[in-house]
Amino acid sequence: TLMRSSAASDVYKRQVQGVLRFLGRGGGQVFPARLTVADTALDVRAFCDTGFSVQEPLSSRAVVLVRFGAVQSRLPPALGTYLEQHFAGAAPLPVPALGVRLVPCTTVAGHCILPAVPASLCCTGSPAGQGRAEHLYAAFADLPPPPDGWEVLVGVEAGEMIHPLRHRQA
């Protein structure tokens, strides 16, 4: 069973890396942001990737991708424990009290399901009241650190809420 969990974990990591490789495009810069999940504010390094686009299927809300290892020690204990069990291959049922939903991601590399919770994100370098993306979902992925060190990957929809002028075409 442990061997099966390890193999499933390896397949999962390859699938999520495929999400990033086939949906993602480089060229942006990492910026300071504050991600709020489960009533906990986390200061993070975010990266806006114009090729990343995932929505929570029931609400159609934008999803940001969070590297679990980068924020694991700062999460509320109940959420951290749930995510640890999920990434260990235990496949726990979503916890309604945490607002966990399972978000499907599909690429040419395959299909994976990511645990996600309601979230908001703001750029900490913007004036108060500006640059805030509300009503998002933060999907967690067990990924190694990328070369540029981002902790949260933001797609165009959430990116436009945070930096409204940066993404508009002339």
Task: Map each language-model feature to its residues.
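A juxtamembrane structural motif centered on a specific transmembrane helix
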Residues: L165-A170
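N-terminal signal-anchor transmembrane helix
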Residues: R25-V30
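Acidic, Ser/Thr-rich low-complexity segments on the non-lumenal side of membrane proteins
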Residues: A38-A70
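Single conserved hydrophobic/aromatic residue that forms the stacking wall/gate
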Residues: T1-A8, Y12
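Membrane-water interface at the C-terminal end of transmembrane alpha helices
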Residues: K13-R21
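A short secondary-structure junction signal
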Residues: F22-G24, R45, P57-R61, L75-A78
